[in-house]
């Protein structure tokens, strides 16, 4: 059983943090309840709490919610449906305009219950072509589309950018 902690004990993670610091980048460690704010926007950490535990280290990655005015986006990292269910029990949810599909669109994430609750207009999955895991899963993509969300994946679209133009959500893809 692995426990969430603010600072990773993984050598590669420590090395990456030191490299970032050496280039003048401020490294932040977040847990549920922490918020980073700018003048117009906020990024809130929803999960994990420092006391959370999980068998799979993926279930301890950050879940973040971005908000700017009426725009909200949910970034669930590599969490599974187990963590999605915890999040549904822990808080009241409002509609999320943009959802970064959990675990690259894995069949073990992006549960129907979560999608019904957050009702995303746009869902984006990040996955490499011909990846060994088969992400995004056809089952997950079907659940996402059946929820009424428009679905975009980096496999087809390359880099994906979501913006608000004249009060409308616009998703742009770039393939070289």
Protein language model regions, located:
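Non-globular, low-confidence helical/coil segments that flank catalytic cores
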Residues: 1-176
């Amino acid at each position: 059983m692995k426990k969430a902690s603010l600072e990773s004990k993984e050598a590669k993670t420590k090395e990456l943090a030191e490299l970032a610091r050496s280039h003048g980048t401020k490294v932040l460690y977040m847990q549920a309840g922490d918020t980073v704010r700018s003048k117009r926007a906020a990024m809130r950490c929803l999960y994990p709490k420092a006391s959370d535990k999980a068998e799979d280290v993926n279930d301890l990655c950050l879940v973040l919610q971005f908000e700017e005015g009426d725009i909200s986006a949910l970034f669930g990292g590599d969490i599974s449906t187990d963590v999605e269910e915890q999040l549904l029990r822990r808080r009241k949810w409002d509609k999320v305009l943009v959802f970064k599909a959990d675990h690259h669109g894995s069949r073990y994430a992006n549960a129907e219950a979560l999608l019904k609750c957050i009702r995303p207009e746009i869902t984006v999955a990040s996955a490499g072509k011909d990846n060994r895991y088969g992400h995004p899963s056809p089952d997950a993509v079907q659940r996402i589309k059946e929820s009424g969300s428009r679905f975009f994946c980096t496999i087809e679209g390359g880099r994906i950018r979501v913006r608000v133009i004249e009060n409308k959500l616009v998703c742009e893809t770039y393939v070289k």
